[in-house]
């Protein structure tokens, strides 16, 4: 086998600075924490946004707007160019077949087909959503669309 002589360039590594070991070390006495105060005490850090006890800005400002996050639907996108390369004429495109061909990650709930690329094969597409351009191209190639609305 090969023998490698792996050395670190000079000056690339530094010894860890030991604090609180005499004033001549540069980090003696207060160990870089300054004099007294909360930050000098053990465990004396304050969270980001802490304003010394007064009502912080993020709580003073009113909540505004609407979030649909709990009901958000994540669509996994598949393009026509991908279908053209992986599928043969007359096949059905659905979640199971997409997973078998490695186009869909496991755990993806919803699938949307977009119209990037061209398609020449007659496919039956059964997905949750489909773009207008993809629908047009699939129908032009002689394919059919079975859409379960998500």
UniProtKB/Swiss-Prot annotation:
Keyword tags: Ribonucleoprotein, Ribosomal protein, RNA-binding, rRNA-binding
InterPro entries: Ribosomal_uL15, Ribosomal_uL15/eL18, Ribosomal_uL15/eL18_sf, Ribosomal_uL15_bac-type, Ribosomal_uL15_CS
Biological process (GO), any one: translation
Single GO MF annotation: rRNA binding
Chain positions covered by the region annotation Disordered: 18-43
Span of the signal peptide: none
Family listed: Belongs to the universal ribosomal protein uL15 family.
Subunit structure: Part of the 50S ribosomal subunit.
Record-given protein name: Large ribosomal subunit protein uL15
Source organism of the structure: Treponema denticola (strain ATCC 35405 / DSM 14222 / CIP 103919 / JCM 8153 / KCTC 15104)
Gene: rplO
């Amino acid at each position: 086998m090969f023998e490698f002589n792996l050395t670190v360039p000079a000056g690339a590594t530094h010894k860890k600075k030991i604090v609180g070991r005499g004033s001549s070390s540069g980090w003696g006495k207060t160990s870089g924490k300054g004099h007294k105060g909360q930050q000098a005490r053990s465990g004396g850090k304050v969270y980001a946004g802490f304003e010394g006890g007064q009502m912080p800005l993020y709580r003073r400002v009113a909540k505004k707007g609407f979030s649909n996050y709990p009901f958000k639907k994540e669509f996994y996108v598949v393009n026509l160019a991908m279908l053209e390369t992986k599928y043969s004429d007359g096949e059905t495109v659905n979640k199971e077949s997409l997973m078998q061909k490695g186009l869909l990650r496991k755990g993806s709930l919803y699938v949307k087909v977009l119209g990037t690329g061209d398609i020449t094969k007659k496919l039956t597409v059964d997905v949750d959503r489909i773009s207008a351009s993809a629908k047009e191209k699939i129908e032009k190639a002689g394919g059919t669309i079975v859409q379960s609305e998500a």
